[in-house]
UniProtKB/Swiss-Prot annotation:
One of its GO terms (molecular function) is manganese ion binding. Its EC number is 2.3.3.13. It comes from Prochlorococcus marinus (strain MIT 9303). SMART domains: LeuA_dimer. This is 2-isopropylmalate synthase. SUPFAM superfamilies: 2-isopropylmalate synthase LeuA, allosteric (dimerisation) domain (SSF110921), Aldolase (SSF51569). Catalyzes the condensation of the acetyl group of acetyl-CoA with 3-methyl-2-oxobutanoate (2-ketoisovalerate) to form 3-carboxy-3-hydroxy-4-methylpentanoate (2-isopropylmalate). Its main location: cytoplasm.
Amino acid sequence: MAKDPGRVLIFDTTLRDGEQSPGASLNLEEKLAIAQQLARLGVDVIEAGFPFASQGDFSAVQRIAQQVGGDEGPIICGLARASRADIKACADAVAPAPRRRIHTFIATSDIHLEHKLRKSRAEVLAIVPEMVAYARSLVDDVEFSCEDAARSDPEFLYEVIEAAIAAGAGTINIPDTVGFTTPSEFGALIAGIDCHVPNMNEAILSVHGHNDLGLAVANFLEAVKSGARQFECTINGIGERAGNAALEELVMALYVRRRYFNPFFGRESDSPTPLTAVRTEEITKTSRLVSNLTGMVVQPNKAIVGSNAFAHESGIHQDGVLKNRLTYEIVDARTVGLTDNRISLGKLSGRSAVRARLEELGYDLTREDLDEAFARFKDLADRKRDITDRDLEAIVSEQVQQPEARFQLRLVQVSCGSSLRPTATVILAQEDGQEQTAAAVGTGPVDAVCRALNALAGEPNELIEFSVKSVTEGIDAMGEVTIRLRRDGQLFSGHSADTDVVVAAAQAFVNALNRLVAGCGRQSLHPQHDAVLADRRPGI
Protein backbone atom coordinates (compact mmCIF):
# COMPACT_ATOMS: atom_id res chain seq x y z
CA MET A 1 0.00 0.00 0.00
CA ALA A 2 1.02 3.59 -0.61
CA LYS A 3 2.54 5.67 2.17
CA ASP A 4 -0.13 7.09 4.45
CA PRO A 5 0.64 10.41 6.20
CA GLY A 6 -2.48 9.90 8.30
CA ARG A 7 -4.40 12.75 6.70
CA VAL A 8 -5.07 14.41 3.36
CA LEU A 9 -2.28 16.58 1.93
CA ILE A 10 -3.50 19.59 -0.05
CA PHE A 11 -1.34 20.51 -3.05
CA ASP A 12 -2.43 23.88 -4.42
CA THR A 13 -1.73 24.54 -8.09
CA THR A 14 -3.65 27.82 -8.47
CA LEU A 15 -0.46 29.64 -9.44
CA ARG A 16 0.46 27.07 -12.08
CA ASP A 17 -2.49 25.14 -13.49
CA GLY A 18 -5.04 27.71 -12.33
CA GLU A 19 -3.19 30.51 -14.09
CA GLN A 20 -3.66 28.65 -17.37
CA SER A 21 -7.28 29.84 -17.41
CA PRO A 22 -7.70 32.12 -20.44
CA GLY A 23 -7.09 35.71 -19.35
CA ALA A 24 -6.03 34.79 -15.82
CA SER A 25 -2.33 35.60 -16.14
CA LEU A 26 -0.84 37.05 -12.96
CA ASN A 27 2.14 39.31 -12.45
CA LEU A 28 4.81 38.68 -9.85
CA GLU A 29 3.26 40.78 -7.08
CA GLU A 30 -0.12 39.13 -7.57
CA LYS A 31 1.40 35.66 -7.41
CA LEU A 32 3.25 36.58 -4.24
CA ALA A 33 0.06 37.92 -2.61
CA ILE A 34 -1.81 34.72 -3.46
CA ALA A 35 1.06 32.51 -2.26
CA GLN A 36 1.17 34.34 1.08
CA GLN A 37 -2.56 33.82 1.52
CA LEU A 38 -2.26 30.14 0.55
CA ALA A 39 0.31 29.78 3.33
CA ARG A 40 -2.15 31.36 5.77
CA LEU A 41 -4.83 28.99 4.47
CA GLY A 42 -2.61 26.09 5.48
CA VAL A 43 -2.04 24.19 2.24
CA ASP A 44 0.75 21.63 2.38
CA VAL A 45 2.31 22.32 -1.03
CA ILE A 46 2.25 25.40 -3.29
CA GLU A 47 3.03 24.72 -6.93
CA ALA A 48 4.31 28.21 -7.67
CA GLY A 49 4.83 27.92 -11.42
CA PHE A 50 6.71 26.41 -14.33
CA PRO A 51 10.21 27.97 -14.08
CA PHE A 52 11.47 26.95 -17.53
CA ALA A 53 8.49 28.57 -19.29
CA SER A 54 9.75 32.15 -19.00
CA GLN A 55 11.97 34.43 -16.96
CA GLY A 56 8.82 35.83 -15.37
CA ASP A 57 7.73 32.40 -14.17
CA PHE A 58 11.24 31.63 -12.91
CA SER A 59 11.38 34.91 -10.97
CA ALA A 60 7.93 34.34 -9.46
CA VAL A 61 8.79 30.85 -8.24
CA GLN A 62 12.12 32.06 -6.86
CA ARG A 63 10.51 35.03 -5.06
CA ILE A 64 7.82 32.82 -3.54
CA ALA A 65 10.51 30.36 -2.44
CA GLN A 66 12.36 33.23 -0.76
CA GLN A 67 9.41 34.95 0.93
CA VAL A 68 6.79 32.26 1.50
CA GLY A 69 8.85 29.10 1.92
CA GLY A 70 9.98 28.45 5.47
CA ASP A 71 10.89 25.70 7.92
CA GLU A 72 7.28 25.56 9.14
CA GLY A 73 5.62 26.80 5.96
CA PRO A 74 4.36 25.00 2.88
CA ILE A 75 6.58 23.06 0.50
CA ILE A 76 7.37 25.26 -2.52
CA CYS A 77 7.15 23.28 -5.74
CA GLY A 78 7.94 23.95 -9.38
CA LEU A 79 6.84 22.02 -12.45
CA ALA A 80 9.30 20.59 -14.98
CA ARG A 81 8.98 18.42 -18.03
CA ALA A 82 11.14 15.30 -18.15
CA SER A 83 14.18 17.11 -19.52
CA ARG A 84 17.41 18.20 -17.87
CA ALA A 85 16.98 21.86 -18.82
CA ASP A 86 13.50 22.03 -17.28
CA ILE A 87 14.55 20.19 -14.14
CA LYS A 88 17.68 22.31 -13.59
CA ALA A 89 15.69 25.54 -14.00
CA CYS A 90 13.14 24.25 -11.53
CA ALA A 91 15.81 23.31 -8.99
CA ASP A 92 17.40 26.75 -9.24
CA ALA A 93 14.04 28.50 -8.82
CA VAL A 94 12.93 26.61 -5.70
CA ALA A 95 16.43 26.60 -4.15
CA PRO A 96 15.76 29.42 -1.62
CA ALA A 97 12.95 27.44 0.06
CA PRO A 98 13.98 25.24 3.02
CA ARG A 99 11.23 22.81 1.98
CA ARG A 100 11.28 22.45 -1.80
CA ARG A 101 10.10 20.03 -4.44
CA ILE A 102 10.59 19.33 -8.14
CA HIS A 103 7.47 18.03 -9.88
CA THR A 104 8.43 16.40 -13.16
CA PHE A 105 6.17 14.62 -15.60
CA ILE A 106 5.81 12.82 -18.91
CA ALA A 107 2.76 11.47 -20.72
CA THR A 108 1.96 7.77 -20.55
CA SER A 109 -1.19 7.36 -22.65
CA ASP A 110 -0.82 5.91 -26.14
CA ILE A 111 -2.57 8.89 -27.73
CA HIS A 112 -0.02 11.27 -26.17
CA LEU A 113 2.93 9.03 -26.97
CA GLU A 114 1.93 8.73 -30.61
CA HIS A 115 0.70 12.22 -31.41
CA LYS A 116 2.53 14.51 -28.96
CA LEU A 117 5.77 12.91 -27.83
CA ARG A 118 6.26 10.65 -30.86
CA LYS A 119 7.97 8.16 -28.60
CA SER A 120 7.53 4.49 -27.89
CA ARG A 121 6.63 3.03 -24.52
CA ALA A 122 10.17 1.70 -24.22
CA GLU A 123 11.62 5.17 -24.75
CA VAL A 124 9.37 6.68 -22.09
CA LEU A 125 10.21 3.87 -19.71
CA ALA A 126 13.90 4.74 -20.17
CA ILE A 127 13.39 8.50 -19.76
CA VAL A 128 11.44 8.29 -16.50
CA PRO A 129 14.08 6.80 -14.15
CA GLU A 130 16.84 8.89 -15.72
CA MET A 131 15.03 12.19 -15.21
CA VAL A 132 13.62 11.33 -11.78
CA ALA A 133 17.11 10.35 -10.63
CA TYR A 134 18.51 13.61 -12.00
CA ALA A 135 15.84 15.60 -10.14
CA ARG A 136 16.54 13.59 -7.00
CA SER A 137 20.22 14.53 -7.26
CA LEU A 138 19.22 18.20 -7.00
CA VAL A 139 16.53 18.09 -4.28
CA ASP A 140 15.38 15.63 -1.65
CA ASP A 141 11.70 15.82 -2.59
CA VAL A 142 10.64 14.72 -6.08
CA GLU A 143 7.13 14.22 -7.40
CA PHE A 144 6.49 12.37 -10.64
CA SER A 145 3.30 12.60 -12.73
CA CYS A 146 2.07 10.28 -15.45
CA GLU A 147 0.30 12.78 -17.69
CA ASP A 148 -3.04 11.50 -18.99
CA ALA A 149 -2.80 8.56 -16.61
CA ALA A 150 -6.57 8.07 -16.68
CA ARG A 151 -6.38 7.07 -20.37
CA SER A 152 -3.19 5.03 -20.06
CA ASP A 153 -2.85 1.26 -20.21
CA PRO A 154 -2.81 0.25 -16.51
CA GLU A 155 -0.11 -2.37 -17.00
CA PHE A 156 2.23 0.17 -18.61
CA LEU A 157 1.31 2.68 -15.92
CA TYR A 158 2.37 0.24 -13.20
CA GLU A 159 5.76 -0.22 -14.90
CA VAL A 160 6.38 3.52 -15.20
CA ILE A 161 5.38 4.20 -11.59
CA GLU A 162 7.58 1.40 -10.26
CA ALA A 163 10.56 2.81 -12.20
CA ALA A 164 9.91 6.35 -10.94
CA ILE A 165 9.75 5.25 -7.31
CA ALA A 166 12.89 3.15 -7.68
CA ALA A 167 14.68 6.23 -9.06
CA GLY A 168 13.74 8.35 -6.04
CA ALA A 169 10.23 9.80 -6.49
CA GLY A 170 8.57 10.26 -3.10
CA THR A 171 5.18 11.22 -4.53
CA ILE A 172 3.43 9.65 -7.51
CA ASN A 173 0.72 11.78 -9.06
CA ILE A 174 -2.10 10.34 -11.19
CA PRO A 175 -3.72 13.04 -13.35
CA ASP A 176 -7.08 12.81 -15.04
CA THR A 177 -5.72 15.35 -17.52
CA VAL A 178 -8.87 15.72 -19.62
CA GLY A 179 -11.48 15.02 -16.94
CA PHE A 180 -12.48 11.78 -18.64
CA THR A 181 -13.15 9.30 -15.83
CA THR A 182 -16.15 8.64 -13.62
CA PRO A 183 -15.75 8.27 -9.84
CA SER A 184 -15.97 4.47 -9.85
CA GLU A 185 -13.42 4.23 -12.68
CA PHE A 186 -11.03 6.66 -11.01
CA GLY A 187 -11.30 4.89 -7.68
CA ALA A 188 -10.56 1.57 -9.37
CA LEU A 189 -7.54 3.09 -11.14
CA ILE A 190 -6.08 4.33 -7.84
CA ALA A 191 -6.83 1.04 -6.10
CA GLY A 192 -5.17 -0.87 -8.94
CA ILE A 193 -2.00 1.21 -8.67
CA ASP A 194 -1.93 0.81 -4.90
CA CYS A 195 -2.29 -2.95 -5.28
CA HIS A 196 -0.12 -3.76 -8.32
CA VAL A 197 2.93 -1.47 -7.99
CA PRO A 198 5.38 -3.49 -5.83
CA ASN A 199 7.18 -0.50 -4.28
CA MET A 200 4.13 1.77 -3.89
CA ASN A 201 4.66 1.63 -0.12
CA GLU A 202 7.70 3.88 -0.63
CA ALA A 203 5.73 6.84 -2.03
CA ILE A 204 2.61 8.89 -1.39
CA LEU A 205 -0.15 8.47 -3.96
CA SER A 206 -1.45 11.77 -5.35
CA VAL A 207 -4.23 12.70 -7.78
CA HIS A 208 -4.83 15.65 -10.10
CA GLY A 209 -8.23 16.20 -11.67
CA HIS A 210 -9.86 18.35 -14.33
CA ASN A 211 -13.54 19.18 -14.35
CA ASP A 212 -14.51 18.68 -18.00
CA LEU A 213 -17.47 16.48 -17.01
CA GLY A 214 -18.04 18.17 -13.65
CA LEU A 215 -16.70 15.13 -11.78
CA ALA A 216 -13.30 16.29 -10.47
CA VAL A 217 -14.17 16.53 -6.77
CA ALA A 218 -16.35 13.41 -6.89
CA ASN A 219 -13.40 11.53 -8.41
CA PHE A 220 -11.15 12.83 -5.64
CA LEU A 221 -13.49 11.65 -2.90
CA GLU A 222 -13.52 8.19 -4.44
CA ALA A 223 -9.71 8.30 -4.62
CA VAL A 224 -9.57 9.03 -0.87
CA LYS A 225 -11.27 5.69 -0.27
CA SER A 226 -8.80 3.93 -2.58
CA GLY A 227 -5.61 5.15 -0.88
CA ALA A 228 -4.77 8.53 -2.43
CA ARG A 229 -3.47 10.97 0.17
CA GLN A 230 -2.35 14.06 -1.79
CA PHE A 231 -4.86 16.05 -3.82
CA GLU A 232 -3.96 18.71 -6.38
CA CYS A 233 -6.54 21.50 -6.44
CA THR A 234 -7.05 25.15 -7.30
CA ILE A 235 -8.89 27.92 -5.49
CA ASN A 236 -12.37 28.41 -6.98
CA GLY A 237 -11.62 25.47 -9.28
CA ILE A 238 -9.99 27.75 -11.85
CA GLY A 239 -7.96 26.21 -14.64
CA GLU A 240 -7.95 25.68 -18.37
CA ARG A 241 -11.11 24.51 -20.11
CA ALA A 242 -13.69 23.64 -17.40
CA GLY A 243 -11.16 24.08 -14.61
CA ASN A 244 -9.64 21.89 -11.91
CA ALA A 245 -10.90 20.24 -8.76
CA ALA A 246 -11.94 23.06 -6.41
CA LEU A 247 -9.91 23.12 -3.21
CA GLU A 248 -12.73 24.59 -1.15
CA GLU A 249 -15.19 21.90 -2.26
CA LEU A 250 -12.83 19.02 -1.49
CA VAL A 251 -11.78 20.42 1.89
CA MET A 252 -15.33 21.13 3.02
CA ALA A 253 -16.60 17.76 1.79
CA LEU A 254 -13.98 16.11 3.99
CA TYR A 255 -14.86 18.49 6.84
CA VAL A 256 -18.63 18.01 6.71
CA ARG A 257 -18.49 14.25 5.99
CA ARG A 258 -15.61 13.50 8.34
CA ARG A 259 -17.55 10.70 10.07
CA TYR A 260 -17.92 8.95 6.71
CA PHE A 261 -14.27 9.30 5.64
CA ASN A 262 -12.55 8.74 9.02
CA PRO A 263 -12.57 4.91 8.77
CA PHE A 264 -10.58 5.07 5.51
CA PHE A 265 -7.77 6.60 7.59
CA GLY A 266 -7.98 3.94 10.28
CA ARG A 267 -9.81 6.27 12.66
CA GLU A 268 -12.97 5.89 14.66
CA SER A 269 -15.85 7.43 12.74
CA ASP A 270 -16.45 10.04 15.46
CA SER A 271 -12.81 11.14 15.66
CA PRO A 272 -12.73 14.97 15.83
CA THR A 273 -9.26 15.24 14.29
CA PRO A 274 -9.43 17.20 11.01
CA LEU A 275 -8.62 15.32 7.81
CA THR A 276 -6.69 18.29 6.36
CA ALA A 277 -4.48 21.04 7.77
CA VAL A 278 -6.48 23.74 5.98
CA ARG A 279 -7.78 26.59 8.14
CA THR A 280 -11.31 26.64 6.80
CA GLU A 281 -12.03 30.13 8.14
CA GLU A 282 -9.55 31.44 5.54
CA ILE A 283 -11.42 29.91 2.57
CA THR A 284 -13.70 32.84 1.70
CA LYS A 285 -10.87 35.33 2.05
CA THR A 286 -8.65 33.26 -0.24
CA SER A 287 -11.42 32.79 -2.79
CA ARG A 288 -12.07 36.53 -3.01
CA LEU A 289 -8.38 37.36 -3.30
CA VAL A 290 -7.92 34.93 -6.20
CA SER A 291 -11.09 36.17 -7.89
CA ASN A 292 -10.05 39.80 -7.52
CA LEU A 293 -6.52 39.31 -8.83
CA THR A 294 -7.32 36.96 -11.71
CA GLY A 295 -10.52 38.72 -12.76
CA MET A 296 -12.21 35.30 -12.76
CA VAL A 297 -15.67 35.94 -11.34
CA VAL A 298 -17.03 33.23 -9.05
CA GLN A 299 -20.44 32.05 -10.24
CA PRO A 300 -23.17 32.93 -7.72
CA ASN A 301 -24.26 29.32 -7.20
CA LYS A 302 -20.71 27.99 -6.78
CA ALA A 303 -20.53 25.57 -3.86
CA ILE A 304 -18.97 26.95 -0.65
CA VAL A 305 -17.78 30.33 -2.01
CA GLY A 306 -20.55 31.52 -4.35
CA SER A 307 -22.58 34.54 -3.28
CA ASN A 308 -25.71 32.36 -3.15
CA ALA A 309 -24.08 29.45 -1.32
CA PHE A 310 -25.71 30.46 1.97
CA ALA A 311 -28.70 32.39 0.59
CA HIS A 312 -32.30 31.22 0.95
CA GLU A 313 -35.08 32.56 -1.28
CA SER A 314 -37.88 30.05 -0.66
CA GLY A 315 -40.23 31.05 2.14
CA ILE A 316 -40.28 27.49 3.45
CA HIS A 317 -36.48 27.41 3.53
CA GLN A 318 -36.27 30.84 5.17
CA ASP A 319 -38.71 29.77 7.88
CA GLY A 320 -36.74 26.61 8.56
CA VAL A 321 -33.39 28.40 8.72
CA LEU A 322 -34.77 31.02 11.11
CA LYS A 323 -35.93 28.24 13.44
CA ASN A 324 -32.77 26.15 13.11
CA ARG A 325 -30.06 26.71 10.49
CA LEU A 326 -29.40 22.97 10.29
CA THR A 327 -32.77 22.47 8.60
CA TYR A 328 -31.35 23.69 5.28
CA GLU A 329 -27.64 24.35 5.90
CA ILE A 330 -24.99 21.68 6.33
CA VAL A 331 -22.17 24.21 6.75
CA ASP A 332 -22.08 27.19 9.09
CA ALA A 333 -21.05 30.15 6.94
CA ARG A 334 -18.67 31.26 9.67
CA THR A 335 -16.75 27.98 9.27
CA VAL A 336 -15.50 29.18 5.87
CA GLY A 337 -14.91 32.73 7.11
CA LEU A 338 -18.04 34.21 5.57
CA THR A 339 -19.08 37.27 7.54
CA ASP A 340 -20.70 40.54 6.61
CA ASN A 341 -18.25 42.70 8.49
CA ARG A 342 -18.78 46.41 8.43
CA ILE A 343 -15.65 48.05 9.69
CA SER A 344 -15.99 51.17 11.81
CA LEU A 345 -13.79 53.33 9.67
CA GLY A 346 -14.60 56.73 8.28
CA LYS A 347 -13.16 60.07 7.29
CA LEU A 348 -11.37 60.43 10.62
CA SER A 349 -9.86 56.94 10.64
CA GLY A 350 -6.10 56.58 10.41
CA ARG A 351 -3.81 54.62 8.14
CA SER A 352 -2.94 52.12 10.86
CA ALA A 353 -6.55 50.97 11.23
CA VAL A 354 -6.91 50.51 7.48
CA ARG A 355 -3.56 48.73 7.23
CA ALA A 356 -4.46 46.37 10.08
CA ARG A 357 -7.74 45.37 8.45
CA LEU A 358 -6.07 44.87 5.07
CA GLU A 359 -3.50 42.59 6.65
CA GLU A 360 -6.33 40.56 8.19
CA LEU A 361 -7.81 40.27 4.69
CA GLY A 362 -4.54 38.89 3.34
CA TYR A 363 -2.96 42.00 1.79
CA ASP A 364 0.58 43.06 2.66
CA LEU A 365 1.05 46.38 0.87
CA THR A 366 4.13 48.50 0.35
CA ARG A 367 4.09 51.97 1.85
CA GLU A 368 3.32 53.52 -1.54
CA ASP A 369 0.48 51.10 -2.27
CA LEU A 370 -0.95 51.65 1.21
CA ASP A 371 -0.89 55.41 0.65
CA GLU A 372 -2.85 54.99 -2.58
CA ALA A 373 -5.30 52.51 -1.05
CA PHE A 374 -5.87 54.79 1.93
CA ALA A 375 -6.53 57.75 -0.34
CA ARG A 376 -9.13 55.71 -2.24
CA PHE A 377 -10.66 54.56 1.04
CA LYS A 378 -11.06 58.14 2.26
CA ASP A 379 -12.59 59.13 -1.07
CA LEU A 380 -15.07 56.26 -0.83
CA ALA A 381 -15.91 57.12 2.78
CA ASP A 382 -17.07 60.55 1.56
CA ARG A 383 -19.57 58.88 -0.78
CA LYS A 384 -20.59 55.69 1.03
CA ARG A 385 -21.83 55.37 4.59
CA ASP A 386 -20.90 51.75 5.36
CA ILE A 387 -17.55 50.34 4.25
CA THR A 388 -17.39 46.54 4.06
CA ASP A 389 -14.54 44.11 3.63
CA ARG A 390 -15.65 43.60 0.03
CA ASP A 391 -15.23 47.35 -0.56
CA LEU A 392 -11.71 47.24 0.87
CA GLU A 393 -10.82 44.22 -1.23
CA ALA A 394 -12.07 45.94 -4.36
CA ILE A 395 -10.10 49.08 -3.54
CA VAL A 396 -6.79 47.42 -2.80
CA SER A 397 -6.72 44.71 -5.45
CA GLU A 398 -5.82 47.29 -8.10
CA GLN A 399 -2.69 48.27 -6.16
CA VAL A 400 -1.59 44.62 -6.12
CA GLN A 401 -2.60 44.18 -9.76
CA GLN A 402 -0.53 46.95 -11.26
CA PRO A 403 2.90 47.37 -9.64
CA GLU A 404 4.30 48.71 -12.91
CA ALA A 405 1.94 50.48 -15.26
CA ARG A 406 2.76 51.93 -18.65
CA PHE A 407 -0.53 53.81 -18.77
CA GLN A 408 -2.23 55.71 -15.97
CA LEU A 409 -5.75 57.09 -16.19
CA ARG A 410 -5.83 60.75 -15.19
CA LEU A 411 -9.36 61.75 -16.18
CA VAL A 412 -12.50 60.35 -17.71
CA GLN A 413 -15.52 62.47 -18.55
CA VAL A 414 -18.63 61.41 -20.46
CA SER A 415 -21.81 62.99 -21.74
CA CYS A 416 -24.78 60.86 -22.70
CA GLY A 417 -28.53 60.71 -22.45
CA SER A 418 -31.69 59.78 -24.33
CA SER A 419 -31.17 62.54 -26.91
CA LEU A 420 -27.37 62.81 -26.81
CA ARG A 421 -24.72 60.89 -28.71
CA PRO A 422 -22.44 59.26 -26.10
CA THR A 423 -19.13 61.11 -26.00
CA ALA A 424 -16.08 60.52 -23.82
CA THR A 425 -12.96 62.54 -23.08
CA VAL A 426 -10.01 60.84 -21.43
CA ILE A 427 -6.55 61.89 -20.27
CA LEU A 428 -3.91 59.17 -20.20
CA ALA A 429 -0.41 59.50 -18.75
CA GLN A 430 2.53 57.57 -20.22
CA GLU A 431 5.47 56.12 -18.28
CA ASP A 432 7.40 59.37 -18.63
CA GLY A 433 4.52 61.33 -17.10
CA GLN A 434 3.50 62.97 -20.37
CA GLU A 435 -0.27 63.38 -20.55
CA GLN A 436 -2.35 63.05 -23.70
CA THR A 437 -6.01 63.79 -24.28
CA ALA A 438 -8.47 62.17 -26.68
CA ALA A 439 -12.21 62.24 -27.28
CA ALA A 440 -14.44 59.71 -29.00
CA VAL A 441 -18.07 58.86 -29.58
CA GLY A 442 -19.59 55.42 -29.25
CA THR A 443 -22.76 53.39 -28.99
CA GLY A 444 -22.75 54.04 -25.25
CA PRO A 445 -20.58 55.78 -22.64
CA VAL A 446 -18.36 52.73 -22.02
CA ASP A 447 -17.85 52.15 -25.75
CA ALA A 448 -16.91 55.81 -26.15
CA VAL A 449 -14.42 55.59 -23.27
CA CYS A 450 -12.77 52.46 -24.72
CA ARG A 451 -12.48 54.04 -28.16
CA ALA A 452 -10.82 57.13 -26.70
CA LEU A 453 -8.38 55.06 -24.64
CA ASN A 454 -7.49 52.91 -27.65
CA ALA A 455 -6.79 56.03 -29.68
CA LEU A 456 -4.20 57.13 -27.11
CA ALA A 457 -2.69 53.74 -26.29
CA GLY A 458 -2.10 52.61 -29.87
CA GLU A 459 -2.11 48.95 -28.85
CA PRO A 460 -4.19 46.72 -31.17
CA ASN A 461 -6.74 44.65 -29.26
CA GLU A 462 -10.23 43.23 -29.37
CA LEU A 463 -12.60 43.66 -26.44
CA ILE A 464 -14.24 40.28 -25.95
CA GLU A 465 -15.84 40.63 -22.52
CA PHE A 466 -17.34 43.42 -20.45
CA SER A 467 -19.15 42.63 -17.22
CA VAL A 468 -20.23 44.61 -14.20
CA LYS A 469 -21.49 43.46 -10.83
CA SER A 470 -22.32 45.07 -7.52
CA VAL A 471 -19.66 44.58 -4.87
CA THR A 472 -22.13 45.05 -2.01
CA GLU A 473 -25.80 45.82 -1.58
CA GLY A 474 -27.42 49.24 -1.64
CA ILE A 475 -27.84 52.09 -4.08
CA ASP A 476 -24.42 53.48 -3.09
CA ALA A 477 -22.65 50.16 -3.73
CA MET A 478 -19.44 50.01 -5.69
CA GLY A 479 -19.70 48.50 -9.15
CA GLU A 480 -16.91 46.09 -10.11
CA VAL A 481 -16.10 45.93 -13.81
CA THR A 482 -14.15 43.14 -15.52
CA ILE A 483 -12.80 43.60 -19.04
CA ARG A 484 -10.99 41.07 -21.21
CA LEU A 485 -8.95 42.00 -24.25
CA ARG A 486 -7.61 39.65 -26.90
CA ARG A 487 -4.48 40.08 -29.00
CA ASP A 488 -2.72 37.44 -31.08
CA GLY A 489 -4.77 34.71 -29.44
CA GLN A 490 -3.83 35.76 -25.89
CA LEU A 491 -6.33 37.08 -23.36
CA PHE A 492 -5.63 39.88 -20.90
CA SER A 493 -8.02 40.83 -18.13
CA GLY A 494 -8.40 43.93 -16.01
CA HIS A 495 -10.87 44.90 -13.37
CA SER A 496 -11.67 47.89 -11.23
CA ALA A 497 -14.35 49.05 -8.82
CA ASP A 498 -15.92 52.43 -8.23
CA THR A 499 -19.27 53.88 -7.26
CA ASP A 500 -19.29 55.25 -10.83
CA VAL A 501 -19.31 52.24 -13.18
CA VAL A 502 -18.08 54.31 -16.14
CA VAL A 503 -14.99 55.30 -14.16
CA ALA A 504 -14.57 51.66 -13.11
CA ALA A 505 -14.85 50.57 -16.76
CA ALA A 506 -12.21 53.08 -17.84
CA GLN A 507 -9.77 51.95 -15.15
CA ALA A 508 -10.45 48.27 -15.87
CA PHE A 509 -9.70 48.88 -19.55
CA VAL A 510 -6.44 50.63 -18.67
CA ASN A 511 -5.49 47.77 -16.32
CA ALA A 512 -6.12 45.28 -19.12
CA LEU A 513 -4.04 47.38 -21.52
CA ASN A 514 -1.16 47.37 -19.04
CA ARG A 515 -1.34 43.59 -18.79
CA LEU A 516 -1.43 43.36 -22.58
CA VAL A 517 1.69 45.51 -22.95
CA ALA A 518 3.52 43.53 -20.27
CA GLY A 519 2.38 40.15 -21.55
CA CYS A 520 2.80 40.41 -25.32
CA GLY A 521 6.07 38.96 -26.50
CA ARG A 522 6.55 36.92 -23.34
CA GLN A 523 7.60 33.34 -24.07
CA SER A 524 4.55 31.12 -23.96
CA LEU A 525 5.13 27.51 -23.05
CA HIS A 526 2.35 25.26 -21.91
CA PRO A 527 3.76 22.33 -19.94
CA GLN A 528 0.83 20.06 -20.72
CA HIS A 529 0.72 20.87 -24.41
CA ASP A 530 4.41 20.87 -25.30
CA ALA A 531 6.26 17.64 -25.83
CA VAL A 532 9.55 16.76 -24.22
CA LEU A 533 12.15 18.77 -26.08
CA ALA A 534 12.31 17.42 -29.62
CA ASP A 535 16.10 17.27 -29.71
CA ARG A 536 16.45 15.80 -26.25
CA ARG A 537 18.75 12.78 -26.13
CA PRO A 538 19.33 10.49 -23.14
CA GLY A 539 21.72 12.22 -20.79
CA ILE A 540 21.23 15.68 -22.28
